[in-house]
């Protein structure tokens, strides 16, 4: 398996999905794992459960500035070359990947994320069967970002959308199977690359006991705050939703749960009723302390593990329609859907006003999770 991020600790949607496949494969044979490491990140091997993989190879990415000016300069160069940012960031390590294989032969090779799909050229020489796991569809994500962003940023996303689509058309049909998170994503993949064999493998989380509830007067948004759709969600919620809730509920706290809160500091600083936890060991337990989970995403692709984690905590969810896309959620049954800022605030207030409704929606979400979205249930979709 080759992954651009380590599966452990399984904090965040990408790591959780990758971890689910590592565990699935480890139950069926020996797994050798190749992961990329960002500068300054801890040793991924020390985070893995003992005995989960046979061998781990860590490829260190070169250091680069995370400042806005440096990021803009890098993306300007990528725009000129029409190379999507993540494809560019993880390209050029064929020699290291080949050395990690070291002449071995494998029954299956799994590549995580479409931006690493070009490594199929190296891995395919050693693997009888090649699988590409799409956490989302990059061309769709860039296309949606381009539709909501204005100016130069929107233009860049539209260019990267077309560049991503060209890569998807080229590489997806070259894999034995392509895993998509939902049937709606699978249909999009088939439209982009008609020759690809697509299998729906839903996002899922490990089965967990229902954690004790603290019922603090807190609403929660969880995820990696550095991820562009999450940054946009925080901005939208602060500007269009939070002002309504803050006025109506004078003791209410909005808590951001997840790593890189500094990425959204411009929208959350200066308000003592907005909290940021940073990384947490157990997102489900942290969510169980709250009353409502909010998913105010304006752009997305794939499906949202943040909703699954809220359901695992039996926490009621308010989401935008695109935030809940790909999941069998039903408005008024296991979550509430709202699109505009005022409608979103009204839906949250409706839940805060009724412990009965919170319990009904949270319990229904938990039942749906147990029925369809634990690792063991998701593994039934796989045949390798």
Residue ranges and their predicted role:
Residues 67-118, 122, 152-172:
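Conserved nucleotide-sugar donor-binding subdomain of glycosyltransferases
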Residues 335-342, 350-355:
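Conserved acidic donor-binding segment of nucleotide-sugar-dependent glycosyltransferases
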Residues 1-59, 104:
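N-terminal subdomain of nucleotide-sugar transferases
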Residues 306-309, 316-320:
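Short hydrophobic beta-strand element within catalytic cores of glycosyltransferases
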Residues 357-371, 381:
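A short, well-ordered alpha-helix in the C-terminal region of glycosyltransferases
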Residues 200-288:
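Conserved catalytic-core segment of nucleotide-activated headgroup transferases in glycan assembly
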Residues 176, 288-302, 313-316:
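Acidic donor-binding loop of glycosyltransferase active sites
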Residues 129-131, 139, 157-210:
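Donor nucleotide-sugar binding/catalytic pocket of nucleotide-sugar-dependent glycosyltransferases
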């Amino acid at each position: 398996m080759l992954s651009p991020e380590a599966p452990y600790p399984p904090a965040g949607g990408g790591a959780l999905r990758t971890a689910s496949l590592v565990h699935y494969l480890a139950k069926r044979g020996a797994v050798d794992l190749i992961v990329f490491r960002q500068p300054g990140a801890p040793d991924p091997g020390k985070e893995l459960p003992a005995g989960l993989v046979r061998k781990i190879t860590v490829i260190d990415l070169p250091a680069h500035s995370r400042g806005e000016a440096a990021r803009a300069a890098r993306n300007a160069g990528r725009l000129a070359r029409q190379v999507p940012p993540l494809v560019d960031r993880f390209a050029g390590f064929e020699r290291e990947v080949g050395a990690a294989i070291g002449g071995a032969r494998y029954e299956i090779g799994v590549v995580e994320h479409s931006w690493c799909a070009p490594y199929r050229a190296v891995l395919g020489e050693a693997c009888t069967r090649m699988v590409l796991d799409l956490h989302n569809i990059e061309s769709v994500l860039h296309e949606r970002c381009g539709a909501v962003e204005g100016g130069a940023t929107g233009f860049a996303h539209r260019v990267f959308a077309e560049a991503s689509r060209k890569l998807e058309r080229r590489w997806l049909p070259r894999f034995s199977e392509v895993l998509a998170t939902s049937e709606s994503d699978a249909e999009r993949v088939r439209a982009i690359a008609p020759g690809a064999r697509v299998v729906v493998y839903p996002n899922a989380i490990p089965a967990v006991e229902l954690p004790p509830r603290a019922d603090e007067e807190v609403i929660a948004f969880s995820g990696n705050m550095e991820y562009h759709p999450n940054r946009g969600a925080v901005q939208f919620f602060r500007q269009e939703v939070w002002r309504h809730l803050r006025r109506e509920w004078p003791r209410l706290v909005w808590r951001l749960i997840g790593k890189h809160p500094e990425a959204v500091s411009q929208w959350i600083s200066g308000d003592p009723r907005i909290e940021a936890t940073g990384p947490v060991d157990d997102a489900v337990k942290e969510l169980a302390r709250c009353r409502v989970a909010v998913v105010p995403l304006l752009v997305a692709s794939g499906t949202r593990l943040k909703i699954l984690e809220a359901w695992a905590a039996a926490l009621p969810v308010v989401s935008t329609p695109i935030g809940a896309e790909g999941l069998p959620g039903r408005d008024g049954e296991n979550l509430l859907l709202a699109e505009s800022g005022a409608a979103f605030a009204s839906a949250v207030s409706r839940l805060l006003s009724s412990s009965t409704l919170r319990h009904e929606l949270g319990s229904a979400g938990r039942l749906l999770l147990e029925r369809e979205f634990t690792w063991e249930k998701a593994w039934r979709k796989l045949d390798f």
